[in-house]
Structures are given as structure tokens and as C-alpha cells.
């Protein structure tokens, strides 16, 4: 598992839900989720596998070593199975501010799913 140098803990959990530093193994899942949910993202075209690998290599991987990275991305797990990803982006370390990024797997992203989206988002924020 990749480790963020700036974090003391690499796993945060509550019952069956957990977040861990984003994993290279989850890149393809995340790409599929992003392409299926472009309407809620700042993404103008579908990502190719090469686009995703390049982004992970050039943008995400360097953040693991940085003492104050511009973002912290996590894989969101339910019973150790990935159900989404997100984290803090555009981090302003000096003023202790950031934006939240959050995306659930497509099947769980429907807002009419008996409040599941709201519940999972709330739990994610708590982790």
C-alpha cells in the first residue's frame, strides 16, 4: 500500500467502511466510474486507460512523498471492497482549507437509492 508521508495513519475506519490511500490497483475502476458519471465531474471527455495511468503517474504518485501535498486521495472501502474514492484537493496548508472530492461507484451514486448516497457521503466525511 502506498503511504502518505504527511499522515500518521494510513487507514481510517468505522465499522465496515474505511478509507486508505488511493491504490494503483483501483485506477481502472475509478476511470470507469468517472467516465460513467461525467455529468457531475469537471471532465470534458471520457478518459482512456492511458490518460488514467498518466494522471496517476504524473499527478497522484508524487503526492505520497510530499510533506504538504496539494491533494490527498483515498479509496473508499466497504468490507475491504472499493465502492468509491475521494479526498481533499486544492489543499491550502497555511490556512487549513481544502475542497472535498467524492465519487461513488456508479451503481451506488443514484440519489434515489433510499438515502444510501447521503449516508455513504456522510460516513466518508466522518472518516
Regions found by a protein language model. Give the residues of each.
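Conserved acetyl-CoA-binding loop-helix of GNAT-fold acetyltransferases
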Residues: 112-127
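Alpha-helical elements of Rossmann-like donor-binding domains used by nucleotide-donor carbohydrate transfer enzymes
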Residues: 29, 54-58, 124-125
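Short histidine-centered catalytic/ligand-binding loop motif
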Residues: 40-46, 107-115
Amino acid at each position: 500500500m502506498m503511504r502518505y508521508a504527511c499522515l500518521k495513519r494510513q487507514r481510517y475506519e468505522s465499522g465496515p467502511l474505511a478509507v486508505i490511500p488511493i491504490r494503483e490497483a483501483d485506477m481502472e475502476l475509478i476511470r470507469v466510474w468517472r467516465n460513467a458519471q461525467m455529468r457531475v465531474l469537471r471532465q470534458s471527455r471520457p478518459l482512456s486507460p492511458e490518460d488514467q495511468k498518466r494522471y496517476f503517474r504524473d499527478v497522484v504518485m508524487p503526492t505520497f512523498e510530499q510533506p504538504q501535498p496539494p491533494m490527498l486521495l483515498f479509496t473508499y472501502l466497504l468490507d475491504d471492497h472499493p465502492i468509491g474514492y475521494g479526498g481533499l484537493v486544492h489543499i491550502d496548508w497555511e490556512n487549513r482549507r481544502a475542497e472535498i472530492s467524492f465519487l461513488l461507484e456508479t451503481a451506488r451514486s443514484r440519489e434515489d437509492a433510499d438515502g444510501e448516497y447521503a449516508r455513504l457521503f456522510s460516513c466518508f466525511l466522518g472518516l
